[in-house]
Amino acid sequence: ETNFREWKLVLQEIVRFLKVDTTFMDVKPLRYCAKFDTYPASLSHVARFHAKRVLKLNDALLTSYHRNEVKFTELTLDTFRMLQCLEWEPSGAFFQLRTAEPDNHVTSNGHTEASGLIDINLAMDMTDPTLPLNPRKAILYRPAATHLVSVIATICEELPPDSIFLIYISASGKTGKTAGASSHIQTVGASRNSLNNKVDSHSFRGSDEVDSHDCDGDYLWLGPKGSAGSNNLYPDDLLPFTRRPLFLIVDSDNSHAFKAIHGAERGETAALLLSPRKPAFWGSSSAGDPSKNGSQFTLFLTAPLQAFCQLVGLTCSDIDKDVYNKADEILSSAFSEWEIKLCKPYSLDLVWAQVLPDPFLRRLILRFIFCRSSLYLFCLREDGEEYLPDCLPKLPNDVSPSSEAMQSNIHQLSECLGVASHFNFDIL
């Protein structure tokens, strides 16, 4: 009976996971695919780009915990998306037909008469020889802070020279009981009445007891395990590991507390991508509940066009396939333009320049730029910075969301999807 209940829970988690993860079915893979994620117009610029030092993504640590978040077993939706984002998409070269003598059940071309399926040699090493090795990844679910720190220390100790270590943490900055998604309507006056429907939603998840002191802390809450101190990860906990190159992604309502790392490093300046403290959405506030859909910031980093559609309240049933493909072409063209801007000599901080040649990290940087520009133009100026992501060190002004070129890219994309009225463009 116990096993039955456990398996029933696992099946329920898988059904819930698949329901959220398959919202947009006919889309590009989350994994890095040379066909979709390299751009002919900017390829030569990236190839010619040379920094004084070049770092390669070798290891990544991924951890996520939010109360009632979408997961199955110990793999959360946010971690799954980021895990896929740091993998190469196989080209298919490793699928080989098993050579076998034809018999009564198998034809000479490798098809079985009964099923018509191609036999695949599952015993072979499932590694695509045409691709580089994937970065090594460690996944932790609801770790104690001491456990997380010990794993980080082990990876840093073994990190090869000229490599960088990516740390992705998705967690709440508050401990407390989820009271449901709260929302409020943003209005902008008669001149922009169309924006009156914009709703931002923010829900934090934590333990059953609310501590007013915890709500103002400068830490991430990793889960209800052990004493309160063992659940909290502070920016200072990561400082000893800045003796090695770090690429830190913090997706939290308290992400900006980790700005304290910048300037306090012990040897290597860390690259920081920090999420907004609150998500923003058009229309239904339910879209902003991370316990139902995963994090908006992580979705922008792993599936940017899907995140943009979610931002403006579009679903797969709302978008014609040809329109979606056209929007994807516009976004790819924008990414290509931004790559060229980033490759300009002397315009990029060394911290970003040394990781730009790495395809995984370059793609994350481009998607961060897209996320920041989209949210900057979507949210009202008086909303403040809590709805905007941030990065340290700063990226060049050429890719600032206030620049005319960046706004033109977002305007073209929003026009294609018929949602230009949802944004505030300075260029119009």
Language-model region placement:
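Active-site-proximal C-terminal subdomain of hydrolase catalytic domains
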Residues: 247-376
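Short coil/turn segments at secondary-structure boundaries
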Residues: 67, 73-79, 95-98, 152-153, ...
